[in-house]
Amino acid sequence: MSDSHHKPVWDRTHHAKMATGIGDPQCFKGMAGKSKFNVGDRVRIKDLPDLFYTRTMTYTRGATGTIVRLVYESPAAEDEAFGNEENVEWFYSIVFAQKDLWPEYSDTFANDTLETEIPERYLEKA
C-alpha cells in the first residue's frame, strides 16, 4: 500500500501550526469583526441543533443571563471539529442565576450563580 493511502483528507496539524508562537485562541484575534453584544447586555440562549459536540450546555438553552466579558474570538467547536476555521465568532462569558437554570434550586442559595462561555451564534437579545 502506498503512502498516498494514508494521508488525511485535511491537514490536522494546520491549527497547531497557525497557533505556534501565538497561542489559541489568540491566533484568531481580529477575525470576528465587531461584537454583536456588549458587557451588561441581557441575552437568551437559543436552542440550536448540534451534531455531536457543542460548548453550549443543554441546561443553558432558553435561559436568560448577563454578559460579563467578551472572552475571545475563535471558530465554534462545532465548526472547528470539521476543519472549518472560516467562521470566527465572539465568545462571551455569561452569568446566570442558578435558580433561572434549575427552578427547584434551593432558596437558601438564592444568590448562587453560574458563569460559562458561549459562542455568539447561540445568543439573542433578551
Curated annotation (Swiss-Prot):
Pathway, according to UniProt? Organosulfur degradation; thiocyanate degradation
What is the E.C. number? 3.5.5.8
The record's section on InterPro entries has:
CN_hydtase_beta_dom_C, Elect_transpt_acc-like_dom_sf
A GO molecular function assigned to this protein is: thiocyanate hydrolase activity
* Keywords linked to the UniProt accession: Hydrolase
Its GO biological process annotations read: thiocyanate catabolic process
Q: Reaction(s) catalyzed by this protein?
A: thiocyanate + H2O + 2 H(+) = carbonyl sulfide + NH4(+)
Q: List the disulfide bonds.
A: none
Coiled coil regions in record:
none
Q: Broadest EC class?
A: hydrolase
Q: Known Gene3D superfamilies for this protein?
A: 2.30.30.50
Source domain of life is Bacteria
Q: What's the stated role of this polypeptide?
A: Involved in the degradation of thiocyanate.
State how it assembles. Answer: Heterododecamer consisting of 4 alpha, 4 beta, and 4 gamma subunits.
Name used for this protein in its record: Thiocyanate hydrolase subunit alpha
What is the gene name?
scnA
